[in-house]
Amino acid sequence: MKETLPKSVQELILSLREKLKDEPEIVDMFERCYSNTLDTTVKKMEDGSTYVITGDIPAMWLRDSVAQLRPYLVPAQNDPELADLIAGLIRRQFMCINIDPYANAFNEGSNGNCWEKDETDMGPWIWERKYEIDSLCYPLQFSYLFWKNTGRTDQFDEVFWEGVDKILTVFETEMNHEEKSPYSFIRKNCSYTDTLSRDGKGAQVKSGIGLIWSGFRPSDDSCRYGYLIPSNMFAVVVLNYLKEIADFVGGKEEIAKKAEEMAKTVKQAIETYGTTHIWGLGDVYAYEVDGFGQYNLMDDANVPSLLAMSYLGYEPESQEVADNTRKLILSEANPFYYSGTKLSGIGSPHTPVRYVWHISKAIEGLTAPTKEEKHQMIHELMATDGGTGLMHEGVFVDDPTVYTREWFSWANAMFCELVMQYCGYEIKK
């Protein structure tokens, strides 16, 4: 074990070795994945914030950076130094949101680096400006979970509340995207999934129905229909978190009321517009809708996803609809569900056909109803590492040595969270 790891992390690994003494190979993989994030992606900044790159791309995604450090919330409960590192990330995330709440990925400094010279309101801090609902949900979720797991509230500072105002403004605006949104995005000479149609506004949706518009999915692919149901589910969860935070802090009655009302509005819209009936199965949640009656029935490996509904904390009005949805997306009725000789599961249009993502296999395990299924998912992940000892993005279903992204910290973190849950280490919510 690396002596450079925080003592709390070393103690967690030793505890897992005791719990899994008959399967040391699981802990070996866990240790590699768990230490990889701290060793290779995390940087403490001079201003006290924490910058976390996604892996083999030198930029910080608001979404990925939360997922990367989320498994450290457990040891941070008794490790103030590790907790400071996490608090630094929260501070950095809200600094970024205050720069531009429509951007999904940010540079370490104001250096002008970017993925592409896109036609949108870019700035020198912004690596990419794809507006995704989840990019605003994840920092709110992390701030809340940090409070619940460490008891700390110093993250709820002026920078946080300024960011909250921007998040609520964006959500309100994007409920009426067609009429009110200032956002557009055009990328030239690219796949259609990397840009938005209609001069950068995206496919038309019905405004004012209570759903929040998103330009892009958590895969960074453009939405077919702008009302992305899993991301709206995530918004409901974090808006309720925000209401609880505002009530606890005090003096934020207006924000608490706005968050509560918005959560109710979005949830009602999900249950009204976000479901459809499948013959022989019943009612299911769609992945995307436009409010005019068109539905996109699929699921994507990236989180938020329909598969991750319970993991995110969304409570459906009907558990039967949620169960039907799970059956649908874990079958070939989902166009991105693939089966091969080595692996079966959910992939993404972001990667080649017949590539299953390690993230989706981890979510399948985290949301599985039995410990036996969780154990099976752990072993499927380990058996498809391509001999690297780490997780990847997409893995070819017939040959695990063929994969995308050798260094993908988000997937490593998801494997770790699954192992921790299997061994009884739950992140407090």
Report the location of each language-model feature:
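C-terminal capping/lid segments that line or modulate ligand- or cofactor-binding pockets
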Residues: 117-124, 129-132, 296-316, 354-429
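Hydrophobic core segments within long, regular secondary-structure runs in both alpha-
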Residues: 10-13, 27-35, 69, 73, ...
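Extended ligand-binding clefts on enzyme/binding-domain cores
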Residues: 62, 101-102, 109, 115, ...
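Long, acidic, intrinsically disordered low-complexity segments
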Residues: 1-27, 89, 167-170, 175-190, ...
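Aromatic-rich carbohydrate-recognition surfaces in CAZymes
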Residues: 58-86, 90-194, 408-425
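Well-ordered alpha-helical scaffold segments within catalytic/enzyme domains
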Residues: 8-22, 67-80, 138-153, 233-252, ...
